[in-house]
Amino acid sequence: MLAKRIIACLDVKDGRVVKGTNFENLRDSGDPVELGKFYSEIGIDELVFLDITASVEKRKTMLELVEKVAEQIDIPFTVGGGIHDFETASELILRGADKVSINTAAVGNPSLITQIAQTFGSQAVVVAIDAKRVDGEFMVFTYSGKKNTGILLRDWVVEVERRGAGEILLTSIDRDGTKSGYDTEMIRFVRPLTTLPIIASGGAGKMEHFLEAFLAGADAALAASVFHFREIDVRELKEYLKKHGVNVRLEGL
């Protein structure tokens, strides 16, 4: 059985990590390369860099950053945010990203999923899906959770797998930032719809939440602030999960 993965997410703007981090032993907590390296050394299984830079002109900064990260880190890393076309996705992968995460662009142009998958392999395509309940149905939202697409979550999950995605990053808008736990109802809803790995996102606040996500059917769990602010120690988290019967990677810790 494949090991369940713990993923740290870094929001990057103009080549710097935003949302404060307070690792005392890091000289520059705003440097994504240094932070990424630190995370890889303490047992995080994968990294996700979300580029929240608004302007296209700043894209060059992200490309240079990806190259630096690729040189320094020996765990898989995904780059997402603002990838609107095949050219951008392609350049990020060629510069060293292991995977690209697409969201709004995939909804607007589903063939982009297929194009990336056919060129680089399905394993390089993560489709990020932001969803929330509307009148009792899980609906897909885009533009950072602001726009209701009118697409049912169940339909979009099936579609992205058919198009060639390798993984789904499932974020519960209702839970994001609340630290009240992952949306296990949503994970359980999606699990039977697809054979793709599901990354649970949104709501991590304590170690039990990770266990709940895995028991609900998630293959990986992503978190940001609980790691950045050292509210959860990665080694302790993995030992806790192992103790509760979850297969996690402990070697090197």
From Swiss-Prot:
Main location: cytoplasm
Localization: Cytoplasm
Active-site positions on this chain: 11, 130
Superkingdom, natural source: Bacteria
Keyword flag Flavoprotein: no
Catalytic activity: 5-[(5-phospho-1-deoxy-D-ribulos-1-ylimino)methylamino]-1-(5-phospho-beta-D-ribosyl)imidazole-4-carboxamide + L-glutamine = D-erythro-1-(imidazol-4-yl)glycerol 3-phosphate + 5-amino-1-(5-phospho-beta-D-ribosyl)imidazole-4-carboxamide + L-glutamate + H(+)
Enzyme Commission (EC) number: 4.3.2.10
Alphabetical list of Pfam families matching this protein: His_biosynth (PF00977)
Gene Ontology cellular-component annotations: cytoplasm
Single GO molecular function: lyase activity
Pathway membership, UniProt: Amino-acid biosynthesis; L-histidine biosynthesis; L-histidine from 5-phospho-alpha-D-ribose 1-diphosphate: step 5/9
Assembly behavior: Heterodimer of HisH and HisF.
NCBIfam families: hisF (TIGR00735)
Full protein name: Imidazole glycerol phosphate synthase subunit HisF
Organism of origin: Thermotoga sp. (strain RQ2)
Lineage: Bacteria, Thermotogati, Thermotogota, Thermotogae, Thermotogales
